[in-house]
Amino acid sequence: MKTILCAVLAVMLGAAHALAADDALGPTANAAFLADNAKKPGTVTRPSGLQYRVLRTGFGRRPAPGDIVRLFYNIHLVNGTLVDSTTPTLPASLAMDTVTMRGLSEALQLMHEGDRWQLVVPTALAFGVKGQGAAIPPSQTLVFDVTLVSAAPPQPGQTVGENPFSVWSNGREAGGAITIHP
């Protein structure tokens, strides 16, 4: 009897620990993170729900539709787990028209070359209830650290890297580079 009771107790404790871990990424934790972040000095909350804070001000141009942007980024979940990043020396290059993550697209249109922003992207502006594979569970708020290196109209024959954000949003595998044709 004692053995059975100990086994039941062990299972219950394991389930409690699993629930506690899930709570760190659950709806309550995501909502609390958004509410707390909105109170931080310098945080701007847009009507869409996107939150951003300017960490460094640049003075270059803003991206226009169709531009090729180069950026450095780190993406974390609200519990601090890093889910994606560029390498420290090689920015991602992507066409603005291929950015399908609404929160990132909205922020990039507001930024200037040289800006470094912290973005807090609510789930509705990120990957929603579907999440993105094993890295991003469903209904997650994402925290970006983004530096916009450059924004320029595409040049004929210019090749840019695969847009990691469109790959995630479309749920397909990376398909190589994108070439701009006149």
List the predicted regions and their residue ranges:
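Cross-family detector of peptidyl-prolyl cis-trans isomerase
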Residues: 2-9, 18-182
